Amino acid sequence: MSNNKKHQNHEHHSHQEHENHTSHGNHEHHHHGNFKSKFFISLIFAIPIIILSPMMGVKLPFQISFTGSDWIVLILATILFFYGGKPFLSGAKDEISTKKPGMMTLVALGISVAYIYSLYAFYMNNFSGSSTHTMDFFWELATLILIMLLGHWIEMNAVGNAGNALKKMAELLPNTAVKLIDNNQREEVKISDIHIDDIVEVRAGESIPTDGIIVRGETSIDESLVTGESKKVHKTHNDDVIGGSINGSGTVQVKVTATGENGYLSQVMGLVNQAQNDKSKAELLSDKVAGYLFYFAVSIGLISFIVWMLIQNNVDFALERLVTVLVIACPHALGLAIPLVTARSTSIGAHNGLIIKNRESVEIAQHIDYIMMDKTGTLTEGNFSVNHYESFTDELNNEEILSLFASLESNSNHPLATGIVDFAKGKNISYATPQEVNNIPGVGLEGTVDNKKLKIVNVSYLDKSNFDYNKEQFTNLAQQGNSISYLIHDRQVIGIIAQGDKIKESSKQMVSDLLSRNITPVMLTGDNKEVAQTVAEELGISDVHAQLMPEDKESIIQDYQSNGSKIMMVGDGINDAPSLIRADIGMAIGAGTDVAIESGDVILVKSNPSDIINFLSLSKNTMKKMVQNLWWGAGYNVIAVPLAAGILASIGLILSPAVGAILMSLSTIIVAINAFTLKLK
């Protein structure tokens, strides 16, 4: 867990520093295995129909007929219509019941018209005594249903693969774990029988069964499949581990801290599913267009039928145009254009430690002008080392001043506090338990140690309260990149401590990448101006706001937004919550296993600045795929529907219902495959 996550609400600020893959049409309840089995069983019924029934009245070389063969065709076609056509008939019923007719209704209309008219043709040819032969559509019906089933089987496979990364995450957790019971006895139990505070043993190469803390042993953990962290992470006593990560070479004993739905993986999958079910503006638009497409297709189909009846007075040809228009129109390709990309995008993000909670953030990311970042823990490591400490009173020596600093900070998890306490421990300097400790927002904290009322404050507090202090010493230490805190007792400055933080290796590259994208990085920090400027100059950041109170960050974001600029704020999900909410995109960095942060639109599990660029890249690639799919889904229908209606019949370009079904299936498959090719970078 990152340090900037741990400091909770300790406003020490230097002391101030401190994204179901979607509903696929109306056949979401069908598993691709159902379409597969239906296809092969339907194939058994369809082959005799194809052999015994002429195509559009034209007998093909391989076709045969004999006395009673038309009865066999009728019986097999009826079975095929109700069995093979069932998914489409059921889907149409669902769509109509929700008053959202779409692809399933169009297909159901197409096969129903073909079947009913073929029944009429069968009656006319066998019972009416008419000398004229009425052409049936049994051949078209059989090929239509076969192609539709095959298309949906392939499509469901492609759709399933779009969310594959999420599926892989779900498979990371083992089914059993080795639990330690009385007298260190080991017992293999089901994961469902593991409870909080149980101790489990994980051997080399095994998956960590639950989130927990190592209580014995040390190892290297492979978290690549869980958080996207490519390097193995060394873990030892008291370190957090994530369920689903892979243990390296050592055997460790882990105390369980979260199970089931409270575990990291479950939270991530829940957030991703929620994000995938929320509709973005682009998706709402595509849904609307897909809805209109049904009425457009039916209208064009009926118009084409009437026009061809007037032109040719040929019911067979006119009916063929109607059926072809109904089956070639594909609102499904349009309806899936965005959800499939979203399923792929949010899954890839989760797999790489980028949890996209708010889908609209992906769209907004294309228009970001400024990215505002906290300094400590975002641009810097947040691991402070003490570089200088000194007493300003004859009554206390330097070590005693250090002890008072450590005492007052001992209950805090803020990075500065942790740095002081760890330094005191390293020098074997004892410290007392503080009493009546309170945060002073944007300043530091106050409390009582050994009956002394003390305050730890920053330089802004000294200036505002007119304290006398050595300004030359402050400037020298600050220019070296130190965060400086002062100890006050009885309105006297009695001590100083200076702590240095290290800039993260990937911060400079991140800033460079932002500038190359015409995005301006802005540093917002509670630290002193000298430290802020030193870090900013090293990173190449020209826009710096220092010595800020927590509420100042939010008002700065508002100021930038008032000029029409789009802002992304990157910071701690707890202390920076108001700023994250105020920004157009709030990105909580270094969440660790606590991904259920309310204030972030995007949650970065790691504290790696390069993930900011990864999010921007993923957003850009996602939008590119969405636009491609929308153009394909809309463009296909604009071209295919008029062709099916016979607009180019005068030059001999006529599409049969079977070809229409092939094109319709291909349109959806192309959209699915295009979504599947989405990559992080």
Curated annotation (Swiss-Prot):
Query: Where in the sequence is the active site?
Result: 374 (4-aspartylphosphate intermediate)
Q: Where is the composition biased (Basic and acidic residues)?
A: 14-26
Q: Name one GO cellular component term.
A: plasma membrane
- State the coiled-coil residue ranges: none
Q: Does the keyword Lipid biosynthesis apply?
A: no
Q: How does it sit in the membrane?
A: Multi-pass membrane protein
Q: What is this protein called?
A: Probable copper-transporting P-type ATPase B
Q: Which organism is it from?
A: Staphylococcus aureus (strain MRSA252)
What is the organism lineage in this UniProt record? Bacteria, Bacillati, Bacillota, Bacilli, Bacillales
